[in-house]
């Protein structure tokens, strides 16, 4: 196998992984989505921020709870509900414009919330936060992931993938 073939295969793998991740992504409060109903400008919205309950208000349908649903599932829900007396054959597209932020604290130079980017690893998240302080441990990293009802604490490494809503804490190292 040539170097060129290996590079092409690697690029395809990365692209397919990020596409799969986007398809599996579950919406929650703080996400910003766009809804496009083809041919229906009054039902198309370029930017909707999900409220604290993970919901948004939509014409004719009222409050739509998107929390825990994938963008594809929200498309199907809106399509089904618009077919019920409003449109004959609605074509709906839902896409994520901005993911909810992740949070990083502890021994980083600039702790706080940062915008999530698909494929973000912990080492890149640390770089976004200005890098590690002099006292930081690159081995004592905890990551809290999950919803309000079920939160999991994970011992993380620098190659761990970060997800939207994650809370990362970098502990001090022992010298």
Task: Please place each PLM-identified region on the residue numbering.
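N-terminal signal peptide c-region/cleavage motif recognized by signal peptidases
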Residues: 16-18
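Short, linear, compositionally biased motifs with a strong N-terminal bias
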Residues: 12-13
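Bacterial N-terminal signal peptides that target proteins for export
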Residues: 1-8
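Ser/Thr/Pro/Gly-biased, low-complexity, turn-/loop-rich segments
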Residues: 2, 20-175
């Amino acid at each position: 196998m040539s170097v060129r073939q290996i590079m092409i295969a690697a690029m395809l793998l990365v692209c397919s992984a990020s596409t799969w991740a986007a398809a599996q992504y579950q919406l929650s409060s703080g996400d910003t989505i766009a809804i496009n109903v083809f041919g229906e400008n009054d039902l198309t919205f370029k930017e909707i921020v999900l409220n604290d309950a993970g919901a948004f208000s939509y014409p004719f349908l009222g409050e739509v709870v998107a929390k825990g649903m994938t963008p594809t599932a929200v498309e199907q829900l809106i399509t089904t509900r618009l077919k019920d007396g409003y449109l004959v054959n609605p074509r709906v597209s839902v896409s994520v414009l901005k993911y909810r932020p992740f949070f990083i604290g502890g021994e980083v130079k600039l702790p706080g919330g940062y915008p999530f980017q698909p494929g973000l690893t912990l080492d890149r998240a640390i770089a976004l936060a200005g890098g590690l302080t002099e006292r930081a441990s690159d081995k004592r990293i905890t990551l809290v992931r999950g919803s309000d009802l079920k939160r999991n604490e994970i011992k993380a490494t620098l190659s761990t993938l970060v997800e939207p809503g994650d809370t990362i804490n970098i502990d001090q190292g022992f010298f």
